Amino acid sequence: MTKSLLSLAVTAFILGGCSLIPDYQTPEAPVAAQWPQGPAYSPTQSADVAAAEQGWRQFFHDPALQQLIQTSLVNNRDLRVAALNLDAYRAQYRIQRADLFPAVSATGSGSRQRVPANMSQTGESGITSQYSATLGVSAYELDLFGRVRSLTEQALETYLSSEQARRSTQIALVASVANAYYTWQADQALFKLTEETLKTYEESYNLTRRSNEVGVASALDVSQARTAVEGARVKYSQYQRLVAQDVNSLTVLLGTGIPADLAKPLELDADQLAEVPAGLPSDILQRRPDIQEAEHLLKAANANIGAARAAFFPSISLTANAGSLSPDMGHLFSGGQGTWLFQPQINLPIFNAGSLKASLDYSKIQKDINVAKYEKTIQTAFQEVSDGLAARKTFEEQLQAQRDLVQANQDYYRLAERRYRIGIDSNLTFLDAQRNLFSAQQALIGDRLSQLTSEVNLYKALGGGWYEQTGQANQQASVETPKG
């Protein structure tokens, strides 16, 4: 009988060669073959290493930021959830894949029963015994039309999409930590600038007030000087609050507090980032994990159509076992005590009020939805990269212009202060020079922050942030199908 069970399993695999999953065709990318061109864009540069393969330690030069990114990759809760989701979908795939194989189980049982005389066929009371041992297969579905294989394929693609989702989460985390860090650094620089400016304003206010007491400055001059002081105090409180909130944001991203032994940060205007090559739009289809995730979900929806189609056809399940049955435990495995059971069952759908057709329509609609999501993901990626490329050149020009503006305001401030001290110009001109310089310095810090975050977002948009070191892409194998 054991040979019969083996033959049955082999027959099931031979019969189960039909699949109703539609042939998969990758949708055309609904974007241009080249990045936008124009006055706002620099010529795209080629490089030996794509941005997605550039390690974040090589991209970010600030040792303090590198330390924070490493901390976040260990402790961040969103990344932990993404990893657990990956494990969960892997387990679900293994559960579904198990339905491809017959579940073989062994059972053993024994019973003793006393039968009273009035219930016995012989008219006498007695004790009956029965022992059994069986090995068999229970309700194994012959996958003649590929329903189980379609569901297994769907589970596999869902699992693979979760792997790409985990990559997306890490890439987003690296960019978020970098942007939060640069915001923290910029707000600290603004706070320090405001603190120094407030001291200057207070000195000017005290000087103007003393001048008013001796009749040199007017009450209007005193009022204007005080206005500048109070305005700086408003900024002082604002940046003090922002610095504290920046620390709180970083703490959440890190999953723990900022390390006490944090490395010394680079200055905000130092060489913070490496150059990232844009490559071609077709490259992001292979390197952006969110695009890969969307395609795996599309393949999962495509596989589900096969399962919905298979539901229209008969399903056959088999139950079979072989074993021994004996009233005496000692003779359970003796010759002549063998027993077997073979119980096929067929289920043929006849009338279901259109539910099977509706299920098939639903699965096709879900595929169309996933096609649209896949195309939208590509379009979003194209926009993000295009925005980053436009920002690269324009921010360079904007920053240079802002530096020139700061220099011009510093010259204006020095001249206005000198002329005010010797009594040529009024206090109003001096206060105007102070305000203009303060505003220009704040704008320079803000523009530098915007430039840094734009480059970080471009690195993220190109798929960068998954590898710690450049060159790891060639060392790591692609995701493997999990084994039982």
UniProtKB/Swiss-Prot annotation:
Record membrane topology: Lipid-anchor
GO CC terms, sorted: cell outer membrane
GO molecular function list: efflux transmembrane transporter activity
Keywords carried by this UniProt record: Antibiotic resistance, Cell outer membrane, Lipoprotein, Membrane, Palmitate, Signal, Transmembrane, Transmembrane beta strand, Transport
Residues spanning the signal sequence: 1-17
Compartments it resides in: Cell outer membrane
InterPro entries per record: OMF (IPR050737), OMP_efflux (IPR003423), RND_efflux_OM_lipoprot_NodT (IPR010131)
Lipid attachment, kind N-palmitoyl cysteine: 18
Sites of S-diacylglycerol cysteine lipidation: 18
A Gene Ontology BP annotation from the UniProt entry: response to antibiotic
Pfam families on file: OEP
Functional description taken from the UniProt entry: The outer membrane component of an organic solvent and antibiotic efflux pump; confers resistance to toluene, hexane, p-xylene, ampicillin, penicillin G, erythromycin, novobiocin and tetracycline.
Family, similarity comment: Belongs to the outer membrane factor (OMF) (TC 1.B.17) family.
Name recorded for this polypeptide: Multidrug/solvent efflux pump outer membrane protein MepC
The species this protein was found in: Pseudomonas putida
